[in-house]
Design a protein with these regions (language model features):
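Bacterial N-terminal signal peptides that target proteins for export
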Residues: 1-9
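C-terminal motif of bacterial Sec signal peptides marking the signal peptidase cleavage site
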Residues: 18-21
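Flexible, membrane-associating and regulatory peripheral segments of lipid-active enzymes
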Residues: 23-85, 90, 94-344, 353-359, ...
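A Trp-anchored, charged/polar loop motif used as the substrate-binding/catalytic surface
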Residues: 76, 323-331, 354, 397-407, ...
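Serine-dependent carboxylesterase/thioesterase catalytic core
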Residues: 99-175, 344-350, 376-530
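Alpha/beta-hydrolase fold catalytic core
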Residues: 311-330, 335-336, 510-546
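Short, surface-exposed alpha-helical segments at coil->helix boundaries
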Residues: 354, 358-362, 388, 392
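Short amphipathic alpha-helix adjacent to the substrate-entry channel of hydrolases
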Residues: 358-374
Length: 546
């Protein structure tokens, strides 16, 4: 007994000594809240280390040493334990491990990296949507948002791989994951364009937008992408104005029909998934298991990317050499026509161009209520041409849009059209809601135009420019810095210099000559002013009849 007592006392003493040693190492170190949150919120998304919560999970199950010794082998072994329980946290740890190791193996064509990134989407998707797992999801837990980001960014990485490997999902394709395969079939969801084999899908995460005051991004599920779409011959028919390619914002979502521990996987079959592509201007949420989830979307980066792909036309050239813009003039749609959205048409001013509006457009599209109700168009025109002539081009472009896009006049939204004009563009916009009668022509001649002998083309040009009525489908006009009563600068040295630089197309420059030879030239200063070289700057004079 005494021997046992001595052994017990010795063991107790050793235990107290060990515990005392540990106690001396436990304590606190003063820090700042910034440092505390930076350390506790760190994860594989913003560093080259696992999150503290993932490391804590590995330590609790005595797995840290195995992980540090051989990360990839550990990941293979650890993933095999997935279906041993209904542990939700294990799925998030696996997703983060796959994402981190995928980054370490990353190259655009790495099969291993692609397998890891796709596996990360499988585990993150299960963490977010499998309602049988424990514990229940807590939307206040930052790991909930981390799971969304791991899913989104892993999917974006996989999109890059798919592009580089030229994999097409028009027919189902089997792609490997850590254990088994995923059979993916592509499905377009309410897209305004026809997907082509030549389309490029570029993750928005790989670009930083510049030149815009604000960056608009809505958080949710899915990988925001920039789609560079090559137009087909069929799509070009009926378009107003287009380039050889269009740039769109889109969101890719990979919808898993099976859980990695579900019946499909247990039987050794591939998990089934659909690769869905959405237009965020048409769809802002998706339904998953009878619940609605917002789509992640980025509208600013595709806008900036579009501008970087195209050489902006010079506003100065558009003023002094009107013929240089002759083929470019007309209406441009930012996205294909949507019959349920009100068209907003931006009309730029003197020596300007449509790209002037991109900053404002970025802010308008960043407002959910506005982008749900409106679609945005641009009118481009050579700004050196006479104001009445440019207004006739705008009028004809709007009438053509009505004929092509809503020939039966059934779209109620089209009848609510809004024009937004800056500077001289405001004058063009104002003319769309005015009735000229014969007031402008009467300044030139007391005789009706039909009684005078003009070449047919010149006669039609004069009719279009000087005789007009309000467009019935234009409901509102917004004026920004518009010189409704003319501008003093038009008669100053700057105006005279501008007029001297403008070179009108021959068909316009010849009209004043024909008029002077045809009409009586004894109707006063107003007539004399209109018979001068009819440039836009002369049209802005305060004494001009316009």
């Amino acid at each position: 007994t005494s021997c046992f007592t001595r052994i017990f006392i010795l063991a107790l003493s050793l235990s107290i000594g060990v515990l005392s040693g540990c106690a001396h190492r436990v304590g606190v170190t003063p820090t700042t809240d910034q440092k505390w949150f930076r350390e506790m919120d760190r994860n594989a998304l913003d560093s080259d280390r696992l999150s503290e919560r993932a490391m804590m999970y590995l330590r609790q199950y005595d797995l840290e040493a195995q992980y540090r010794k051989a990360p990839l082998q550990f990941l293979e072994d650890f993933s095999r334990t997935l279906c041993q329980d209904r542990d939700r946290e294990k799925r998030l740890v696996l997703a983060e491990l796959c994402y981190l190791e995928g980054k370490r193996q990353e190259s655009p064509t790495s099969d291993l990296a692609a397998k890891l990134f796709l596996s990360a989407t499988v585990y993150a998707h299960s963490y977010l949507h499998n309602q049988t797992l424990q514990p229940a999801l807590n939307p206040f837990d930052p790991r909930y948002r981390m799971a969304c980001d791991i899913y989104n960014r892993s999917l974006a990485k996989f999109v890059v791989y798919v592009q580089e490997r030229d994999i097409r999902f028009a027919e189902a394709q089997s792609v490997p994951i850590l254990h088994g395969k995923v059979e993916i079939k592509g499905v377009a969801k309410d897209l305004p364009w026809q997907p082509q084999k030549t389309d490029e899908y570029l993750p928005s995460y790989e670009f930083l937008a510049k030149g815009l005051n604000n960056y608009h991004r809505d958080f949710g599920l899915g990988a925001p992408v920039i789609v560079v779409h090559q137009l087909s011959g069929e799509e070009s028919v009926g378009r107003l104005k287009t380039n050889l390619e269009d740039v769109y914002a889109a969101t890719v979502y990979l919808r898993y029909e099976d859980d990695p521990c579900g019946e499909q996987a247990v039987q050794g079959n591939a998990l089934r998934a659909q690769a869905e592509v959405y237009d965020p201007l048409r769809t802002d949420s998706i339904s998953i298991d009878d619940s609605s989830f917002p789509l992640e979307m980025d509208l600013s980066t595709p806008l900036a990317y579009m501008l970087s792909r195209r050489s902006p036309a010079s506003g100065l050239v558009g003023m002094v050499r009107a013929d240089a813009w002759d083929e470019k003039k007309g209406l441009y749609l930012l996205a294909p026509y949507q019959s349920d959205k009100i068209p907003v048409v931006f009309v730029h001013g003197l020596m300007s161009k449509p790209y002037t509006w991109l900053g404002m457009l970025n802010e308008l599209m960043g407002d959910q209520e506005i982008r749900e109700r409106y679609q945005f168009w641009f009118f481009m025109y050579p700004t050196g041409n006479p104001i009445p002539y440019s207004a006739s081009i705008l009028r004809n472009a709007l009438l053509e849009a009505r004929q092509k896009l809503d020939p039966d006049g059934k779209d109620k939204a089209f009848d609510q059209m809004v024009l937004v004009g800056h500077s001289m563009g405001g004058i063009l916009s104002r003319i769309m809601i005015q009735d000229s009668g014969d007031r402008l022509w009467s300044v030139l001649s007391k005789k009706p135009l039909e009684e005078l002998c003009f070449p047919e083309e010149q006669c039609q040009t004069l009719k279009d420019a000087l005789f007009f009525k309000p467009l019935p489908f234009v409901r509102r006009v917004v004026f920004i810095a518009t010189p409704h009563r003319g501008s003093q600068m038009a008669t100053g040295w700057i105006g005279r210099l501008g007029v001297s630089l403008i070179k009108l197309p021959v068909k316009l420059a010849s009209i004043p000559v024909t008029l002077a030879q045809t009409v009586s030239t004894e109707q006063g200063e107003a007539q004399a002013l209109m018979l001068k070289t009819p440039s836009s700057i002369n049209g802005l004079r305060m004494d001009n009849p316009m």
